[in-house]
From Swiss-Prot:
NDH-1 shuttles electrons from NADH, via FMN and iron-sulfur (Fe-S) centers, to quinones in the respiratory chain. The immediate electron acceptor for the enzyme in this species is believed to be ubiquinone. Couples the redox reaction to proton translocation (for every two electrons transferred, four hydrogen ions are translocated across the cytoplasmic membrane), and thus conserves the redox energy in a proton gradient. Its main location: membrane. It comes from Campylobacter concisus (strain 13826). It catalyses: a quinone + NADH + 5 H(+)(in) = a quinol + NAD(+) + 4 H(+)(out). It is a peripheral membrane protein. Its cofactor is [4Fe-4S] cluster. HAMAP family: NDH1_NuoB (MF_01356). This is NADH-quinone oxidoreductase subunit B. GO terms for cellular component: plasma membrane; respiratory chain complex I.
Amino acid sequence: MAKHQINYAANGGLPVVLTTVDKLVQWGRSNSLWALSYGLACCAIEMMASGASRYDFDRFGTIFRASPRHSEVMIIAGTLTKKHAEFTRRLYDQMPEPKWVISMGSCANTGGMFNTYSTVQGVDRIIPVDIYIPGCAPRPETLQYALMMLQKKIRKQSAFRAQKPRKLEI
């Protein structure tokens, strides 16, 4: 072997190539988030307002989709009832991997002021949540900031991550 050649087999392969591919995939995923708009209550009004031209989520690569099979991000906005929990879990399971969840508003985060027998006390009891947005009802700027935080989180993760499925706990 010549002096200017590097023995990659002795060093464990080509980490530069894998790192570059990983960063490329992370960049593509973080800049093309297709969100499932899943509004359940008052926070859905703010989520709809975020789709207006004033906030322009398209410039960040976020496009709202109606089908879970075409979405990577589920934005749950509003109060989740126990009857609706199974349907929410089914929608989450229909989303392709990798998938992320944003819980928007106090009702989605903790059940809000409705501590009744029919309300789920937080979406994280049904599906794993990546970003929590506090407030009642949070402004569209807050949702925009949460999507930017999710983009940063995606860039830090490995491009080939997979989550283990969780059981439905009510």
